[in-house]
């Protein structure tokens, strides 16, 4: 299957990580250690920023088999609800200002989409599969924690809001602005010649590899960047 989950500007959402690590730097064991390290960092700063304590079994880890050029994983953190993707992006930005989240893709915090559990990228056979990881003396959430595999799948969607999230404090844009002065995204200086803007854009698009035109996620990211 080749399914993706998407969201709108004001969709309530859970925090997640998208990790892609090059095979030349990692083996399976090192990649699992990277996953654990990044999970612990998110747990640490959720407590520091929002006074929320993620439990290890609030965390769902999805991982592909080793690919020719990389290891990939999606991590979903259940239990704390964010007002929208912009608030998630702010959480990520504030974390990385204090501590590195190695090999994590920040582009997922836009108005974009995320590949679902059991799905692969089109034309490839590396689906994201649930894995159970031991962190300290506890294990991350797994299929066996739910009555059915469908129940588990629904919980892997970051737009699924259940009773636990509704009971907890939602992290809103208003709260973030009141607590912290959120900096704007850095703008790269460009040539101010408006007459050349259309030409420059055509030049950029003409030099894109073909795969960027054939894969929705990559094309979507190009659009957001431009």
Q: Model segments located where?
A:
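Signature for HUH/AEP ssDNA processing cores
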Residues: 1-73, 77-101, 114, 120, ...
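Short basic/aromatic active-site micro-motif
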Residues: 111, 216-221
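Long, low-complexity, charged/polar intrinsically disordered accessory regions
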Residues: 110-190
